């Protein structure tokens, strides 16, 4: 069995406890306008362009048959959706400025990468985190990878939107030690507007997890996106929903990530902000926490 993997990040300290290896799987059913990993949204393998590697030799344009690569305003642009001989273009690029955004990997191939970090997992309950994209979109591969990790005694975690059938989640639960579940927007209207899908399935899955013995595995997360998720109404709305199920749930408020903007240049897409916002200050993060407290939650984690 193989899966579509767009990155494996070693020595990660932001995707769970301790030192972790984070495996990023391609494909996501959500289309969040602020997506932190836009290269992982499409399930298809697509070309990406690294401008900092480019020597502007224009070999890619010469090898392009269907204008998949063009020059506009003295800048190289790629058009990933065009039917193009991408493998030839990539092979001819002398600096690796154009590359594919992912590769097919077997469970064993991924495990070979994971084992390189295994000796570090003993410090601080480290292990493997499967992220994306949305790993539940490739749930069969995710399940086999989790099983392989557990066979080797490796702590496992998943970062997920929970936008999947409940039966899929049940398939993975026996092999998960930690579940980081995104709850981005409280209202159906806002969720449809900013992510393109309803939040009802997500809310139902959160309820299922928090009403069973699995609730201690769960940390609910909300990324703070200016003018979208980082509002009093939204944070209080999420907190009230969670409080109505399990008031002691762990709820993490994630700071805005300004580094995501650079990834949009790789795939030749516009970012949702004309001017990239800055990180929220500690004072602002504490205010977000206070709004969650007003909504009835007690166990709140702030990412500064």
Each language-model region and where it sits:
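N-terminal pre-triad scaffold of radical SAM enzymes
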Residues: 5-59, 76-85
